[in-house]
């Protein structure tokens, strides 16, 4: 067994070491349509909207923010009010550019919320990559808890929630 040929190496599928965020819209149109529709009108499905000028003025004032200010590009806010901010495949605010200067800002569609809100992946697991492919192939949905953990499902909800739900009152 010598070294692999260049052609053989190219044929091998590359599976990213770190999964990439895919967004809540990937859950819609699959087995989770009802969950997606319920999420869209839930508090998590509207977190980014709270950062806009004039939204939740009383709550912003209570935590010493300015209701007339736009917080939709503020990094401190985006880490909890979006999906995967500053992570692979995660939300990119308006004005985001890649190394070549190309605009890579996330698309925002009010009719089909996605990474600009707190989506499924923020609580359950990052869905892109090898993990998602394995889960999607098992259409029976009969995973044991250990299997779901192996593919990234989070069960320590108290720790997951407190990453964001510790904002001062």
Regions found by a protein language model. Name each.
Residues 1-5:
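C-terminal segment of classical bacterial N-terminal signal peptides
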Residues 6-117, 121-155:
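Sequence context of c-type cytochrome heme-c attachment sites
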Residues 119, 160-161:
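Short beta-strand-alpha-helix junction that forms the catalytic/metal-binding core
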Residues 161, 165-169:
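Solenoidal tandem-repeat scaffolds enriched in leucines and small polar residues
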């Amino acid at each position: 067994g010598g070294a692999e040929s260049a052609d053989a190496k190219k044929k091998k599928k590359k599976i990213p070491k770190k999964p990439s965020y895919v967004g809540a819209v990937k859950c819609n149109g699959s087995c989770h349509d009802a969950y997606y529709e319920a999420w869209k009108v839930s508090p998590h499905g509207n977190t980014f909207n709270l950062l806009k000028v004039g939204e939740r003025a009383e709550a912003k004032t209570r935590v010493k923010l300015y209701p007339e200010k736009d917080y939709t590009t503020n990094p401190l806010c985006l880490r909890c009010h979006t999906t995967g901010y500053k992570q692979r495949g995660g939300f990119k605010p308006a004005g985001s550019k890649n190394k070549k200067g190309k605009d890579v800002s996330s698309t925002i569609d009010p009719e089909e919320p996605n990474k600009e809100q707190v989506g499924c992946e923020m609580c359950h697991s990052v869905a892109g990559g090898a993990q998602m492919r394995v889960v999607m192939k098992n259409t029976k949905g009969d995973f044991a808890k250990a299997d779901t953990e192996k593919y990234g499902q989070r069960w320590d909800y108290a720790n997951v929630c407190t990453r964001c739900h510790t904002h001062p009152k």
